[in-house]
Amino acid sequence: VCVSGGDVYAAGSLQSGLTKPLAVVWKNDKAHYTLSDGETPAGVNALCLSGRTLYAAGHSGGAAAVWKDKELLYTLTDGSSYAEATAVCRFGHTLYTAGYHTDGFEEEGVVWKEGQELFDLSDGPGSGSMPYSVAVCYDDIFTAGTIFGTTRTAVVWHGDEIRYTLSDGTGHSEAYSMYVLSLIHI
């Protein structure tokens, strides 16, 4: 969800009857625009409003995708394995996206900068990862999500390193959101 003035934007997917899910952005209580053509399944997982430009992160045809307003901006993966963009943020003039692709039977978290893979979010072999939120402050990139091993463990990454483990690992936990207020560089 994004808010601008008195307008509320929401995004997700819409499926009617036997059609494939469409990636849709709503403005207030009406469909604002559709981002996909219905030929392949698509959906939006996150929005970022920068000035008057609305960015949407999601998937189309099994590939991670980012849209700028109504137009496809980046296809982040080649579609050879299922992938989704799960988070998007803009810092200055740079767009960052987090998401995942499947590697065999495991999800592997990734952060992209301007449509190019910047780094992956791994905890080593046998442990997948799933980012749900990304925030950037100057040169610091933070991602919140989950690593998979014997349990699901909520973590926050700083760059490609785990900064905080948010649970003790005895049960399942997932971090879905975060917010970076400010950083002081000394």
Model-predicted segments: where are they?
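Conserved small/polar residues in nucleotide/adenosyl-binding loops
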Residues: I184-I186
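Repeated scaffold domains used in trafficking and secretory/extracellular systems
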Residues: V1, P41-C48, Y82-C89, G128-V136, ...
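Structural motif
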Residues: L18-L22, G62-A63, F105-E108, T150-V155
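Recurrent small/Gly-Pro-centered beta-turn motifs in extracellular repeat architectures
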Residues: A11-L14, A56-S60, A98-H101, T143-I147
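Beta-propeller blade signature
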Residues: V24-K27, V66, V110-K113, V155-W157
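Short loop/turn motifs that cap or connect beta-strands within the blades
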Residues: A31-P41, L73-S81, L118-S127, R163-H172
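Tandem-repeat architecture and repeat-register "anchor" residues
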Residues: V1-S4, A11, T34-L35, S50, ...
